[in-house]
């Protein structure tokens, strides 16, 4: 039985298959190994991938892009509001959740982000089944390290709705290390690996300590203001300037023309990762004018010089945060489509001149390859050359906190499980509640990444406690997080022995 791994990114999706002792990304029906994470709604059909991306110029308000940005988020979430401001689609609020308003003329409907993600997962399932010639259900799915519980739940629900049975969700940096087998070569050795991921809409940098086969995240940071699309936009602006210089027409305010330029710039950007120059041709760009412009790699690098600086600074900041110097890093792993850019690779190499930089697996394929290897391990049908399962231990992605009331009556947050804790893990904490009350509500929050805002994701209520004339209730709280990220919380009144337990599932 084959095993598959799926990576759903903000701009692209990719599926890899583990079979006969190796993991490989498989091509879709268009012959491409990476599929645009774009869904278009037409009068008679729904299209996914390249066809949807190409038809967006004519069908912008019914074509959904970057859906991962709002998966599992509320309508009022700042990420959702940013997505809405950038979207060509109409997004409305339904019961506190964002939904896309689709109007093809034939029908009008409201589509959730989970529905859109389901269609992309279905495309990945079809791609894998076409390559294998048989049905496939079991899958490992990758998630960003800073994904919250609600986001993971939404991602899991979308995959399940597409017909997948989720074996496990693993963090993207862990999948990247698995793809290169990092940790298996010297299972008793210790090393530090920097995982650099430049995706379509964000940049993340993670430093992982590999020790005795265990991954431990030392630090991670994510930046949502820089991504591959920024390079595309910069090149599109340059092309618009060239058009104005040649034809004395400023098209920057014309949404349709700029979308055409964005498509051409995106193709050129990818080509310039392997070629010295690329030709940008747009048929009938504006007012019937065909636009033709050649862009060299050197010109592209000059246009994007400030963006390259933005992409390198986060590495320096993260190393400074954990007190590392460049020579404290043993390996650098490149992930994400824009990590293919030669100039960026050179700048990273300049930062780590003595460090091995791993890019033999295409950066936009390394994460799904690692996920497929993990799937192969879990299914256990393949004869693996090494015991890779010894290095698949995950870490908690965010701080898990409990809200308490201090002596002054003010709320305070106590960290029960710090981010980066190797899983599985078990922690306990004694919560004190006023003796005159007969019930205690324990609220759990998560806080991760750079945001200081805690997010409540669960609560547990302990009822029918014996009231006390004086003193406090001592409530023993035990939190257990399994390797798959599921949380099991038990609260016990130490006096009466009354107990309640809840489980917050990471995967369906």
UniProtKB/Swiss-Prot annotation:
- Give the CC-aspect GO terms: cytosol
Q: Give the record's keywords alphabetically.
A: ATP-binding, Chaperone, Cytoplasm, Nucleotide-binding
SUPFAM superfamilies attached here? Answer: Actin-like ATPase domain, Heat shock protein 70kD (HSP70), peptide-binding domain
Q: Which Pfam families does this entry report, sorted A to Z?
A: HSP70 (PF00012)
Among InterPro entries, the record links this protein to: ATPase_NBD, HSP70_peptide-bd_sf, Hsp_70_fam, HSPA14_NBD
Tell me a Gene Ontology molecular-function term this record carries: ATP-dependent protein folding chaperone
Protein localization: Cytoplasm, Cytosol
Its domain of life reads: Eukaryota
The entry describes its oligomerization and partners as: Component of ribosome-associated complex (RAC).
Described purpose of this protein according to its UniProt entry: Component of the ribosome-associated complex (RAC), a complex involved in folding or maintaining nascent polypeptides in a folding-competent state.
Q: Which family does it belong to?
A: Belongs to the heat shock protein 70 family.
Family annotation (PANTHER family)? HEAT SHOCK PROTEIN 70KDA
Recorded protein name is: Heat shock 70 kDa protein 14
């Amino acid at each position: 039985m084959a095993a598959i791994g799926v990576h759903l990114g903000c701009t692209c999706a990719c599926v890899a298959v583990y079979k006969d002792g190796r993991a490989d990304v498989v091509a879709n029906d268009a012959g491409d190994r990476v599929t645009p994470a774009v869904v278009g709604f037409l009068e008679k059909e729904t299209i996914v991938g390249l066809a949807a991306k190409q038809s967006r110029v004519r069908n912008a308000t019914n074509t959904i892009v970057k859906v991962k940005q709002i998966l599992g988020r509320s309508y009022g979430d700042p990420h959702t509001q940013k997505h809405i401001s950038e979207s060509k689609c109409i997004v409305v609020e339904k019961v506190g959740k964002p939904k896309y308003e689709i109007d093809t003329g034939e029908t009008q409907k409201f589509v959730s982000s989970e529905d859109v993600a389901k269609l992309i997962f279905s495309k990945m399932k079809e791609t894998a089944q076409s390559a294998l010639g048989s049905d496939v259900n079991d899958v490992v799915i990758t998630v960003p390290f800073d994904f919250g519980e609600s986001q993971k739940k939404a991602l899991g629900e979308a995959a399940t709705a597409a017909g997948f049975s989720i074996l496990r969700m693993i963090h993207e940096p862990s999948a990247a290390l698995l793809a290169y087998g990092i940790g298996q070569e010297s299972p008793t050795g210790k090393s530090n690996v920097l995982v650099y991921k430049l995706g379509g809409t964000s940049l993340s940098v993670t430093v992982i300590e590999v020790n005795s086969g265990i991954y431990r995240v030392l630090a991670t940071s994510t930046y949502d203001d820089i991504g591959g699309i920024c390079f595309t936009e910069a090149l599109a602006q340059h092309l618009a300037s060239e058009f104005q210089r040649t034809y004395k027409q400023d098209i920057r305010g014309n949404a349709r023309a700029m979308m055409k330029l964005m498509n051409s710039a995106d193709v050129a950007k990818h080509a310039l990762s392997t070629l010295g120059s690329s030709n940008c041709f747009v048929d009938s760009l504006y007012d019937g004018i065909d636009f033709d412009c050649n862009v060299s790699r050197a010109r592209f690098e000059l246009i994007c010089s400030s963006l390259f600086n933005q992409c390198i600074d986060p590495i320096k900041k993260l190393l400074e945060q954990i007190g590392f110097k460049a020579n404290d890093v043993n390996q650098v792993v490149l992930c994400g489509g824009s990590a293919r850019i030669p100039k960026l690779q050179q700048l990273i190499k300049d930062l780590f001149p003595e460090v091995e930089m791993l890019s033999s697996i295409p950066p936009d394929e390394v994460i799904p390859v690692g996920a497929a290897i993990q799937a192969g391990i879990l299914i256990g049908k393949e004869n693996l050359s090494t015991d890779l399962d010894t290095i698949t231990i995950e870490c908690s992605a965010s701080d898990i906190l409990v809200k308490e009331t201090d002596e002054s009556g003010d709320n305070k947050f106590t960290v029960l499980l710090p981010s980066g804790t190797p899983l599985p893990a078990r922690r306990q904490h004694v919560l004190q509640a006023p003796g005159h009350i007969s019930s205690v509500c324990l609220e759990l929050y998560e806080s991760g990444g750079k945001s200081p805002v805690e997010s409540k994701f669960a609560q547990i209520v302990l009822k029918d406690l014996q009231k006390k004339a004086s003193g406090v209730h001592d409530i023993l709280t035990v939190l257990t997080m399994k390797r798959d990220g599921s949380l099991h919380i038990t609260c016990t009144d130490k006096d009466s022995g009354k107990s309640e337990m809840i489980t917050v599932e990471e995967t369906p």
